[in-house]
Swiss-Prot record:
Maltosyltransferase that uses maltose 1-phosphate (M1P) as the sugar donor to elongate linear or branched alpha-(1->4)-glucans. Is involved in a branched alpha-glucan biosynthetic pathway from trehalose, together with TreS, Mak and GlgB. This is Alpha-1,4-glucan:maltose-1-phosphate maltosyltransferase. Alpha-maltose 1-phosphate binds at K262, Q322, D357, N394, K534, Y535. The record marks D480 as: Transition state stabilizer. Homodimer. The active site is at D393, E422.
Length: 670
């Protein structure tokens, strides 16, 4: 039976109109595109919701945040707190991965309104006999709603209040016992329920904090020039684990086409021994659900995944929905591709560039439903082999509706699945992919290099609505991108960009071993590696002098030991001055704090990889409720040294040839 091809729509609550519902609920936050898309959190996070809630006049109101797992009937309720100016707030701890729903409701509390009015009249010395009898009527209605013991308690209070203006009646009216019993039996018949049920996507913990390492399996044979295998890669796992990575990302592991195969450095004609680009997927040996024969068997791949998991590492697979001309789909499903007037299949183009070894899939095919099913089956196949994380190649060049349908339906079956969107494209496209189901997003971090650029970009990612649904994953390099910042070959520059990625974002990755070996030679005139591993098998010397493997391992240990660095959004940039009133443009500092406030990390990085830089740093003591003159200590987790700081302004200095960064753990007096 074919699946239903329906995209989600905002869930609106069409309750019959009743003019007696006086409470107004407005500006619920977070809410993405009117409830069209889910907010995202990670299991164990707290989900905080705010809303404007008010009514006419001065009556007291009560509000609740409601939440439940999608598909459940009953709601859990959390009382909301008034935080000023008719703004209300509440939170709850999210559970296991899956989809949740939440909304808000509020109602007039006639008992609280009456009780407050009674107290004011008593304070003014007025007669309250009639008011007490009015209160008895309100409490009697509460008794009718109450259950078991509370019903009897409230009937008792009705008797006391009905007497009128006696001291006993007044005492009963203001008693905590009556208040507690009435709060347990609220009058919700005329409650206003927000007109939308909003969605909350809960992801596995690695969605919030992960450390990625990309490598090409074919380059890891112990025999020079020989094609590496999954068995060879198992031997790499301890080294990768020691560096502190918990996600291994493999470029496509499928059979590679022969037709129009690319040669070394993307040459149009391949030599007899050139392995081709692994993104030219498909040959007589199979397509997207097959492994390249020279890498090994499917059983050996599964063994690799299992061994990685045993060492605390998840395996992420690259999914590239494109085909070589030799892919079985070209013959089996020609309707999924575009054909030119001369009868040849349309290859990929970005005029004037031509990519004749790759065929794009036609998402306007008349057979689009079967196409969608087949593409989704690729994910499901690899999930069946133990893969839970996918990096998707160029998703912005495929139909957005497909991603929303496919990722949503996959997540319904396998809620722990993660998807990284490799989309270096326009901001609105990147945002839509994140809204439509992608767990992580590649970013513009690679091209943000000055202090102003970095701070402006991080502010956009963490202080706007983007923070509610788009999780950045920072990569200082990829097999496709060697930014000019790294082309100078400075070891310090590689450490600088690494530390920035690892401490600005809780999710980051590197393409290795090119990065830890400070590989920096570009193809002339391009942001690409010379002799790119995309087109050839490399033989790496992992112990090459000048590598930064120990620095990577150290910073990753710091990340794992400090919860403040395991989140992205709580970041405060600090002022660093070269002289009074003059901002330092080469020293950048930022503070992160764990959700419970117990772990505070201050990172200071020099952006100058050649010269020593120093300046006066202002630590934001007021953020932590401390006076500007507070004395405290900071421990540099890189050097192991501890410094005593006196007040908010303190001097910092970095020599890039020693270490271009401080990662301070801030210890404020208890």
């Amino acid at each position: 039976m074919k699946p239903e091809f329906v995209l989600p729509a905002p869930i609106r609550l069409d309750r019959p109109f009743d003019g007696r519902r006086r409470v107004v609920i407005d500006r619920v936050f977070p809410e993405i595109d009117g409830g069209r898309f889910p907010v995202k959190r990670v299991e164990g996070d707290r989900m905080t919701v705010e809303a404007d809630i008010f009514t006419d006049g001065a009556d007291t109101i009560v509000a609740e945040l409601l939440y439940r797992r999608k598909g459940e009937a009953a709601w859990s309720a959390v009382p909301m707190t008034h935080i000023g100016n008719d703004r209300w707030k509440a939170s709850f701890e999210v559970g296991a991965p899956g989809m949740c729903e939440y909304t808000v409701q509020g109602w007039v509390d006639h008992f609280e309104t009456w009780r407050k009015g009674l107290q004011k009249k008593l304070d003014a010395g007025q007669d309250v006999s009639l008011d007490l009898r009015i209160g008895a009527t309100i409490v009697e209605l509460g008794a009718a709603r109450a259950k078991d013991e509370d019903a009897g308690t409230l009937h008792h209070y009705v008797g006391l209040l009905s007497v009128g203006g006696s001291d006993a009646a007044v005492e009963a009216a203001l008693s905590e016992g009556l208040l507690a019993a009435m709060r347990r039996s609220p009058e919700k018949a005329m409650a206003t329920l927000y007109d939308k049920i909003l969605l909350l996507q809960i992801d596995q913990k690695k969605a919030g904090f992960s450390t990625w390492y990309e490598f090409f399996p074919r380059s890891w044979s112990e025999e020079p020039g020989k094609h590496g295998t999954f068995r060879d890669c198992i031997k790499l796992l301890p080294r990768i684990a020691r560096m502190g990575f918990d996600v291994i990302y493999l470029p496509p592991i499928h059979p590679i086409g022969l037709t129009k195969r690319k040669g070394k450095n993307n040459a149009l004609v391949a030599g007899p021994d050139d392995p081709g680009s692994c993104w030219a997927i498909g040959s007589a040996d199979g397509g997207h659900t097959s492994v390249h024969p020279e890498l090994g068997t499917m059983e050996e791949f599964e063994a690799f995944v299992q061994e990685a998991e045993a060492q605390g590492i998840s395996v992420a697979l690259d999914i590239a929905f494109q085909c070589s001309p030799d892919h079985p789909w070209v013959k089996e499903h020609p309707q999924w591709f575009r054909w030119r007037p001369d009868g040849t299949v349309q290859f990929a183009e970005n005029p004037p560039k031509r990519y004749e070894d790759i065929l794009p899939i036609d998402f306007e095919s008349e057979d689009w439903q079967n196409l969608w099913i087949a593409l989704r089956e690729v994910f499901l196949f690899w999930i069946g082999k133990g893969v839970k994380i996918f990096r998707v190649d160029n998703p912005h060049t495929k139909a957005f509706g497909f991603w929303e349908w496919a990722l949503g339906s996959i997540r319904e079956q396998y809620p722990e699945t993660m998807f990284l969107a490799e989309a270096f494209t326009r901001p609105k496209l990147m945002a839509r992919l994140a809204k439509g189901g992608y767990t992580h997003s590649y970013t513009y971090f690679t091209w943000r290099n000055t202090k102003h650029e970095l701070q402006e970009y991080l502010t956009e990612l963490t202080q706007t609505e983007l923070r509610e649904y788009m999780r950045p994953n920072f990569w200082p390099n990829t097999p496709d991108i060697l930014h000019e910042e790294l082309q100078g070959g400075s070891r310090a520059r590689f450490i600088i960009r690494f530390v920035l990625a690892a401490t600005l974002s809780s999710n980051y990755g590197i393409y290795g071993p090119a990065y830890e070996l400070c590989e920096h030679v570009p193809y002339p005139g391009k942001e690409e590696y010379l002799d790119s591993e995309k087109y050839e098998i490399k033989q790496w010397d992992l112990d090459r002098p000048g590598n930064i493997r120990s620095e990577i391992a150290m910073v990753n240990r710091i990340r794992h030991n400090n919860p403040a660095l395991q989140q992205t959004s709580d970041i405060t940039f600090v002022k660093i001055e070269v002289s009074q009133g003059q901002e330092h443009d080469q020293l950048m500092g930022y503070v992160k704090c764990s959700p419970d406030g117990a772990n505070i990390i201050l990172t200071v990085v020099t952006l100058d990889d050649r010269n020593t830089q120093g300046g006066w740093l202002r630590f934001p003591l007021e953020k932590f409720g401390r006076p500007h003159t507070e004395r405290f200590t900071v421990e540099d987790l890189i050097s192991g040294r501890t410094f005593e700081w006196n007040g908010e302004w303190n001097y910092v200095e970095l020599n890039p040839h020693q270490m271009p960064a401080h990662i301070f753990r801030v210890n404020l007096p208890s």
